Amino acid sequence: MSRSKQTDEKKQARKAVGERRSPFASGMDFETSEAYNVLRTNIILSLPHKRRGNIVGTTSSAPHEGKSYTSVNLSYALAKNGSRTLLVSADMRKPTVEGYYEVPLSPGLSNLLVGSVPQDSLMEVIRPLPEYSENLFLLPAGDIPPNPSELLGSQNMGDLLRKLATLFDFIIVDLPPVTTVVDPVAVSPNLDGMLVV
């Protein structure tokens, strides 16, 4: 087999894996897609009527219940509806959101919170996702820290979310399961709402 043919096959395989992991790119059925649109509408109606800066955390009671999948699809539904939407990968223990978009973990949230990346470089760390929607952006988790709950409950996290709230209509914060670690509780004072999957 020729080298160029092998390269083409590898590209196709990577594309297929990306499409399989990216829920909307793979052609979700109507009922599932509509369920996320209903969820989007319910969240919009249940939050304070702010034009910008609605911050919603997503968590679950246990691992493998679909909270990251829900975060990805909810963010997409909000962005497709015309809202400038940021998905924050804040499960710094087992980040998975980045895999849906084939985006590297670092630099990201943890780097901003510990100061290894200055907050004035924020827009260099946030990744636009125009192949999905011109309104969709991702803040990756960053390097895995030894103290995620302390970082999420820190003043730096509150300051960062307030700054992000001036830049985006919706911020979806993907968090670890609430019954396994304290991370969702630590960040909750800075959220407008919490979705438990």
Task: Tell me the role of every PLM-derived stretch.
Residues M1-I43:
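Acidic-aromatic/histidine active-site loop/patch
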Residues L78-L138:
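Phosphate-binding loop that captures ATP/GTP phosphates
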Residues P128, A141-V182:
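Phosphate-binding/switch loop-helix module in NTP-utilizing enzymes
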Residues G57-T59, V88, P140-A141, V173-D174, ...:
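Conserved beta-strand segments of the P-loop GTPase G domain that flank and frequently precede/overlap
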Residues S26-M28, S106-V117, D143-G153, V196-V197:
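Flexible beta-alpha connector loops of hexameric P-loop NTPases
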Residues E19-R20, L39, L112, L138-L139, ...:
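Conserved beta-strand/loop subsegment of P-loop NTPase cores
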Residues P177-V197:
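Conserved P-loop NTPase nucleotide-binding/switch module
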Residues E31-G99:
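Walker A/P-loop phosphate-binding motif and the immediately C-terminal alpha-helix
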